[in-house]
Amino acid sequence: MTNRAGRPRPSRLFGKCGVSLNIFDIMGPVMVGPSSSHTAGAARIGRVARHLLGSQPAQAEILLHGSFASTGAGHGTDRAIVAGLLDMAPDDPNLPHSFRIAKDAGIEVSIRTVELRDAHPNTAVLHLTDRSGQTLSVSASSLGGGRIRVNSIDGMGAAFSGELPTVIIRNEDRPGIVSEVSRALSRRGANIATMQLYRDRRGGLAVMVMECDDPLPDGLREELAAIDGVVRCTCLELEGG
């Protein structure tokens, strides 16, 4: 089966309720095994968290919930998350050696289990600190097939996968910042596919998450970070998964 350009088109299967599944959703991603949920997804969680922090962490506390906690050791979930923190993709052949590589890099890693309320069974919470003392807390879940969902950043809600080029901004909650950010994206030709807004309280801290259709233009992060009231800006574009 081909598309209009004559290129092969992935076959699709239809399950109950008419849900359409791409054959690649069933086969899963290219990865170091054994599990797309417990290994590939876990590596992606660690990698997204590292990019949200903005640098390699010096300390990492990793909390594993549900099946991540009960079967994660056998599936290499802990090693996969640490590999992601080292910026390894799920198919990196060094993934099984991530503990040693992290130790050689001087990263302090602690791993323990936790029971979270109303959380997806494949959920991890990461508390990270870089060498400058900057901190980050991220909750994320592995949904299967190497796909993930970030649930919260520093305790504030979020819901994004990291599959699209994504801008994440932490800012003061006051009038005008959202419009300034939107104008900056428009000036540089970045089209927003989805936009989410969260805040801890009125007048407190807020999070903007904007998924974009195309690669993010050069210099965008610096322009957004310079907007008055923006506390931290991350432009998330992961190569290699």
List where the protein language model places each region.
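N-terminal amphipathic/hydrophobic targeting modules at extreme N-termini
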Residues: 5-6, 10-12
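Acidic-glycine-rich active-site phosphate/pyrophosphate-binding loop
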Residues: 12-23, 54-58
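A conserved regulatory-domain signal marking ACT and ACT-like small-molecule sensing domains
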Residues: 111-114, 139-241
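Generic N-terminal amphipathic, Lys/Arg-enriched alpha-helix
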Residues: 21-34, 233
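Conserved phosphate/anionic-ligand binding catalytic regions in large, soluble enzymes, centered on
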Residues: 28-46
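Short glycine/threonine-rich loop-to-helix capping motif typified by GTGT followed
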Residues: 71-79, 121-123, 205-211
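A structural-propensity feature for long, helix-poor, extended segments
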Residues: 61, 65-104
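Contiguous domain-boundary segments centered on the initiation and propagation of an alpha-helix
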Residues: 86-136
